[in-house]
């Protein structure tokens, strides 16, 4: 499964047993909704998830500042269509200063959009009801199309951020992002507090949609929060807005999460509606990196089944659909060209995977946005980075121990083999945009073959297997000094460079020069030479 699954934790999914079942069915990221969580829950949830699977990420969704009504006598206010209401007298907001940005003719929505008003005058500030309804204490207020200055985070958010950093969560989601400065403000606070978490911007206002191009540049990921976005926009516009947000995010290398009412019927029912399956399918085809469950997994009756449903639909769609690459990428053109080369090479040779060796994650992000047919394995020495990259479409973490600067190509291959994800003979495209990985230099793309790795050099000729010899009885001659007793061998392995005259005499043979071996090849040992990559392996019985 390439599409990732995000699930909100709540009473229905807070036990280790249920969480393990959800993870076993494909859960990649656990969401803590700070609006309904206690700050003490962060440490408890983090420890539980890490004890089950250390590759699963954790996100704290910050509530952020909200615009709401005050309280009413008796707890409610009946609204009559056509009637005028004076703000500050009939209806009070928790921040009356925001009205300075509102003009005559603007619409104001209250109670999650159920009650609509139009501004009649600003002195006194009077609004006219456009429909009947009832307002309750602290009803949500939206003012579509206007930038509303509410600040970025609250004191409560700051407390959650500090706790999240202390517990090592991986993501912070920022609510009601309207401009890039909101994201920058949160990131500054995270860095000043000692954190390096990825920032997910929730697009749920018209201002956020209008400023999406600048927001993606400041963000690591984008959440299409269709609930509030569907209040601020006419419902007919939400689907195309979703497509526009996803496309814009991918052009900048940001991952995307589609959220709200993904499988809402499964809060109470064990199976989804046909419309929900259609919605999920189209979100995947739109190139969403992840789909998010909210009430379905937090308070629903069937949290495991909801995750399983997303997995089943994702598996089917991914098997049937060819995904479009990002045709334009607004980033480092050299690194993007390397990523594109890795994708094209992988698709052409039908590789079993792309191993992207990364320190910052940028190479992995770009390759993921190109939607290669093979899975992308994010090989990194940072466990935290591995979890962050696990949210990207088609990416799986491959955590390696040690210092990146000290890892040789052979050591990297050993980690790949020990991961158990690849059988002997698997073809891998290996790429790095980072200079300290020493398997070929900066911005490199190579093909490697998985097996019992012995060494690697510069190869010419066909792939073959045979018995190694340091004398005359064997198929593959081993030479440490560049000398040979004759040319009647099928292949030659030199641990040094050789003279052009000798190379010319071996034309038509398989030759490996400057071979670097991780161990001594024994006399009579059967080995395999990959003529395309120069990799030397222990030969399996079926290799010829």
From Swiss-Prot:
Record-listed substrate binding positions: 31, 227-228, 260
The protein's required cofactors: Mg(2+); K(+)
Binding site for Mg(2+): 204, 228
Catalytic activity: pyruvate + ATP = phosphoenolpyruvate + ADP + H(+)
InterPro entries xref list: Pyr_Knase, Pyrv/PenolPyrv_kinase-like_dom, Pyrv_kinase-like_dom_sf, Pyrv_Knase-like_insert_dom_sf, Pyrv_Knase_brl, Pyrv_Knase_C, Pyrv_Knase_C_sf, Pyrv_Knase_insert_dom_sf
Quaternary assembly: Homotetramer.
Name assigned to this protein: Pyruvate kinase
